[in-house]
Amino acid sequence: MATPKQKASRGQTHSRRAKFYSAYKINVVKCPKCGEPKLPHRVCLNCGYYGDKQILEIGE
């Protein structure tokens, strides 16, 4: 099996893997309470709810 003659630098590794990581797109879902787009498994920053529970107090 081929082995590298020298250690690949961090920049080489990151630039090689950049193509792989750019293939992932960010998943966005609608908040069930207010309908605003939010990241899944996160508290909605618009209304402060996570599922049925209010986690953040949002001043209006």
UniProtKB/Swiss-Prot annotation:
Domain of life according to the entry: Bacteria
MF term (GO), any: structural constituent of ribosome
Key words, A-Z: Ribonucleoprotein, Ribosomal protein
GO biological process: translation
Keyword Ribonucleoprotein belongs to the record: yes
Pfam families referenced in this protein's UniProt entry, alphabetically: Ribosomal_L32p
One GO cellular component term noted in the UniProt record for this chain: large ribosomal subunit
HAMAP family on file: Ribosomal_bL32
Family to which the UniProt record says this protein belongs: Belongs to the bacterial ribosomal protein bL32 family.
Name the UniProt record assigns to this protein: Large ribosomal subunit protein bL32
Gene: rpmF
